[in-house]
Amino acid sequence: MSDFIASKEDDYSKWYLDIVQKAKLADYSPVKGCMVIMPYGYSIWSKIQSILDKKFKETGHENAYFPMLIPYSFLEREKDHIDGFSPEFAIIKDAGGESLAEPLVLRPTSETIIWNMYSKWIKSYRDLPLKINQWANVVRWEKRTRPFLRTTEFLWQEGHTAHATEEEALEETLLILDVYKRFIEDYLAIPVFCGKKSEKEKFAGAVSTYSIEALMQDKKALQAATSHYLGLNFAKAFDVKFQDKDGKMRHVFASSWGVSTRLIGALIMVHSDEKGLVLPPRIAPIEIIVIPIFKKEDEINKKILDYCDCVVDALKKAGFRVEIDKDVRSSPGFRFSSAEFKGIPIRLEVGINDVLLNSVTISRRDKDRKFKYQISLDSLVSKVKVELDLMQKDLFQRALNFRILNTKEIFRSSKDSYETFKAYVNDYSGFVLSCWCGSLNCENIIKNETKATIRCIPDDFKARDLTGMTCIYCSSKAKYFVLFAKSY
């Protein structure tokens, strides 16, 4: 175990915070509950942005930007929306030395101000669909905060679309859910469950919410992304109508969806270890770090550095994201640890013997420190590609194996009861697949007694037969298979 990072088993929360700080991802700001995202942390967010932005544009979305200041009256137009968010509002009542005629809310989410603009922009069926994405910051006055996972201010993207039909809006909602799922699994190497939220857990103002749920190493769930079908709620609140092909005026159907810097928290908690951050290659800002092993003689060191420059050039020409650590003041061990803290997937060591043999020594961040071997310069590009691809797959498989191991099925039977369910959730956590009757009362009691919530009605188990199945709490006829878990 590193002398600088707490043990996961002894203090999971401190382990997480140690990695955030030691990997220089973020620091605490003077404002309570806010964080400063440091350059390395922001570079991860930039990678997330660039990949998702491309995917949004491929699916017909355009970027725009809407004001951070929202008139309070806008939020009052959708009752469920304001009821859900009002405890988290940050409100400005004075500006320029005077009291404002109307309070302004710092953006908690942008449905209201965007739909106010849509009422001006949408008049005809020719204006639809309207598919806009925004990269922005959000302010929600959280009581209990933790860097990346839950902060007063955070960065996110939010998509807002308008459609002529319910079918189109639902299709959009599920399309984006799939975009998120593929991104999180293919790039972040995090296996996820997708499914519909219960009425209790859905987004304030939505008809239905679909979420993506991942399991962290402490066996708590984390909601990684959401996609909402809004129906006509916001169109009616802001009187957004269009003239259809028959000349009739109709309200517009809507969706909204988003992910945030919380994904960085998920990366940390799914993959990292007691040596520091572990980043999947496809999302790592730096895929490869080249570390020269210096000697005392300047002439030898010049040969090593010249050789390292050739290695870096070859890798950059092949399209890899690579850097070299030329810090002559620090020992190789210190520089190895620094690369481990930052989670850089591949480390290439170059000593004078490597120069003489026309080779480099390669190691992988997700492997034991004893895992290293020499490769020739001729095979450098192909070998590095193989190891990066293997690491991406191995990280996903390791996380999937962990989730499988910590997903338990507990149903009412002669062997198992609600007490079995409750004892398991309280003692072991993880995901529990069980049955639910759809009653809010049962959902509330389970949450109060176990702190576990219904994470989603998972798509993975839709095909399973509910015949004869009963609610884990009340034993009434079951309507759904659901995933329970304690969560962030």
From Swiss-Prot:
SUPFAM superfamilies: C-terminal domain of ProRS (SSF64586), Class II aaRS ABD-related (SSF52954), Class II aaRS and biotin synthetases (SSF55681). It is an enzyme of class 6 (ligase). It catalyses: tRNA(Pro) + L-proline + ATP = L-prolyl-tRNA(Pro) + AMP + diphosphate. It comes from the Bacteria. GO terms for molecular function: ATP binding; proline-tRNA ligase activity. Keywords: Aminoacyl-tRNA synthetase, ATP-binding, Cytoplasm, Ligase, Nucleotide-binding, Protein biosynthesis. Homodimer. This is Proline--tRNA ligase.
